[in-house]
């Protein structure tokens, strides 16, 4: 019995030692001091995830919702549904919301009309809620119909966890009983940090000109008129502002009691653009604040810009030990294969040699002749130093195909028959 107890003690000590010297993946990833309920930083070009923290948890997104409203506005303009010069006639709904001093707004006159351009600038720079409602009503007729468009577009983007109940990101309780029909009076828009990053990437990919407005530190609404109001950008990480960050040029803050202090930011340095999302950021005392969300974003971007673009495989490079693949019914038994285009990704500066690649076959094995030169046979799989596959938004893989580098013609029927007979005889011995 004493011997058994002694062995149990030894095993427990060994387990503790192993836990210390061999941290699990979660421990290994805890390298970014991000004080937030959820966070993610990705390469905007490829969608490669550089760091994620609780990034699949569905949380409140507050005014980050307006990025979807912006997307639908740009799409409507592109499709000719509306134009920048189209006038919006203020409704009772948008007018009453615009007069609520608790909310971010530019006041709208009840008998006034405003162009899409004016409303868009107020939404993008000042997060104006009534202006956003005006855009929604112009495009879809009602905010209810616009919300349906928001949810449909999210699914089209591959976002499965989005739940939009209004166009602004406000809690419905602030909409004075005029919230979209079919939504709860205390509901709020929700999504995961990963999905917010997908939305941000789609917006930047499809309508990069959005940054022309998002990067404006301040602008006068209706300058030179009695309605003139100074709009200061809520993104104070822009150049010349309180939390200035080199390369920052967008994109959208968000704050409600439910969502906390959140931010979807983007910055570009040395040709690399990153997207960082923080949700419900807090300070060291656990309190939410404007400073907290920007400090968390800074930590994410600093970490991300510590990565370097690295060519993991060159175009034409072959896989060691898999320079060729077997071919059935061909004039040759094997066909040479190689990477069709270079494989590039962002890797930490200190881990340039830590990544390796594998060939992931997409064609049947063995291949059956005829095999044409250039025929795709697989994809490149990239693994990190801990043997984990490099992760991308929406599960994308590195955009690198593996293809045949020669043609193997199909053998004639006699050769195929003789080969089958030879294989049969070989199998007897």
Please give the residue ranges for each predicted region:
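Structural motif marking the loop-to-transmembrane transition
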Residues: 1-4, 8, 61, 112, ...
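Sec-dependent N-terminal signal peptides of Gram-positive bacterial secreted proteins and lipoproteins
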Residues: 2-28
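Periplasmic/cell-envelope proteins involved in peptidoglycan metabolism and beta-lactam response
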Residues: 2-4, 149-154, 426
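Active-site-adjacent loops and short helices of periplasmic peptidoglycan-processing enzymes
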Residues: 23-194, 204-208
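Domain-terminus/edge residues, biased toward the C-terminal soluble/receptor-binding domains
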Residues: 177, 184-190, 194-429
């Amino acid at each position: 019995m004493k011997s058994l107890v002694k062995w149990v003690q030894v095993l427990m000590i060994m387990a503790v030692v192993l836990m210390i010297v061999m941290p699990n993946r979660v421990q290994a990833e805890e390298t970014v001091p991000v004080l937030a309920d959820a966070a993610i930083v990705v390469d905007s070009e490829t969608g490669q995830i550089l760091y994620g923290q609780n990034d699949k948890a569905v949380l409140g997104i507050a005014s980050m919702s307006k990025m979807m409203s912006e997307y639908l506005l740009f799409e409507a303009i592109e499709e000719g549904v509306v134009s920048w010069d189209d006038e919006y006639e203020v409704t009772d709904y948008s007018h009453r919301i615009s007069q609520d001093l608790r909310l971010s707004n530019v006041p709208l006159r009840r008998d006034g009309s405003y162009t899409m351009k004016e409303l868009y600038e107020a939404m993008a720079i000042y997060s104006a809620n009534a202006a956003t409602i005006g855009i929604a009503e112009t495009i879809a007729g009602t905010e209810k119909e616009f919300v349906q468009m928001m949810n449909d577009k999210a699914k089209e983007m591959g976002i499965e966890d989005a739940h939009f109940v209004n166009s602004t990101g406000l809690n419905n309780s602030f909409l004075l009983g005029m919230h979209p029909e079919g939504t709860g009076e205390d509901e709020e828009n929700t999504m995961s940090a990963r999905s917010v990053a997908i939305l941000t990437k789609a917006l930047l990919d499809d309508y990069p000109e959005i940054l022309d407005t998002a990067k404006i530190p301040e602008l006068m609404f209706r300058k030179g008129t009695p309605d003139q109001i100074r709009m200061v950008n809520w993104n104070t990480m822009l150049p010349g502002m309180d939390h200035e960050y080199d390369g920052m040029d967008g994109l959208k803050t968000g704050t409600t009691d439910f969502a906390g202090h959140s931010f979807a930011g983007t910055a570009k340095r040395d040709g690399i653009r990153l997207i960082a999302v923080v949700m419900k950021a807090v300070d060291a005392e656990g309190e939410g604040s404007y400073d907290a969300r920007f400090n968390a974003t800074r930590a994410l971007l600093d970490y991300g810009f510590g990565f370097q673009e690295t060519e993991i495989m060159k175009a034409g490079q072959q896989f060691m030990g898999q320079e060729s693949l077997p071919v059935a019914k061909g004039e040759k038994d094997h066909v040479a294969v190689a990477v069709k285009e270079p494989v590039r990704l962002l890797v930490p500066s200190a881990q340039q040699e830590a990544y390796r690649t594998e060939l992931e076959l997409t064609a049947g094995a063995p291949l059956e002749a005829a095999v044409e030169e250039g025929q795709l046979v697989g994809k490149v799989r990239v693994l990190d130093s801990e043997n984990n596959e490099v992760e991308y938004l929406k599960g994308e893989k590195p955009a690198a195909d593996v293809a045949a580098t020669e043609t193997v013609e199909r053998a004639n029927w006699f050769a195929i028959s003789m080969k089958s007979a030879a294989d049969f005889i070989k199998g007897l011995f």
